[in-house]
């Protein structure tokens, strides 16, 4: 119902270090959110979390017409972003099925965010696994980029 959906997007508690990590990554990468769900709920959550300003693009299944883990979801998002080199893309997520299997279906590297240290009993095989968001930086950034964190003139082009 409408009231329920409007309330869902009002609250969002970002993961520990989310803002700082996104700020660092935004200096060297294009950041896109890919999410199954309802557009206004996901946009509301991003705004409520204070992270929306750090996101370059948002792709939600309601608007995309297909859900993760379908390869078409990722293919469409990459096309809209103008990404030709899939080797420069990393799908990061906490869902082995939607995020990790979905990214793999699209031929993309994946990183499973697993802060609780859960066992992977699925068939999905992440390229990387992290317990803390901060652990993304050395995966995504070259050493020179890690050294340049804080210098916004060093941004990647997709």
Annotate the PLM regions.
Residues 19, 23, 30-158:
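Asp-based, Mg2+/Mn2+-dependent phosphohydrolase catalytic module
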Residues 1-2, 111:
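Intrinsically disordered, low-complexity segments enriched in small/polar residues
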Residues 2-32:
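Short, acidic loop-to-helix structural element flanking the phosphoryl-transfer center
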């Amino acid at each position: 119902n409408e009231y329920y959906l409007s309330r869902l997007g009002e609250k969002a508690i970002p993961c520990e270090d989310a803002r700082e990590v996104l700020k660092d990554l935004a200096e060297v990468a294009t950041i896109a959110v890919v999410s199954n769900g309802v557009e206004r709920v996901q946009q509301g959550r991003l705004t409520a979390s204070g992270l929306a300003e750090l996101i370059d693009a948002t792709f939600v299944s309601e608007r995309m017409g297909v859900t993760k883990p379908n390869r078409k979801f990722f293919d469409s998002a990459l096309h809209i972003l103008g990404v030709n080199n899939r080797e420069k893309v990393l799908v990061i997520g906490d869902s082995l099925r939607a995020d990790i299997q979905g990214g793999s279906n699209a031929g993309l590297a994946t990183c499973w965010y697993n802060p609780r240290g859960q066992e992977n009993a699925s068939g999905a095989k992440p390229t990387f696994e992290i317990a803390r968001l901060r652990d993304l930086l050395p995966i995504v950034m070259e050493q020179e980029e890690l050294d340049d964190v804080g210098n916004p003139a060093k941004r990647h082009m997709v």
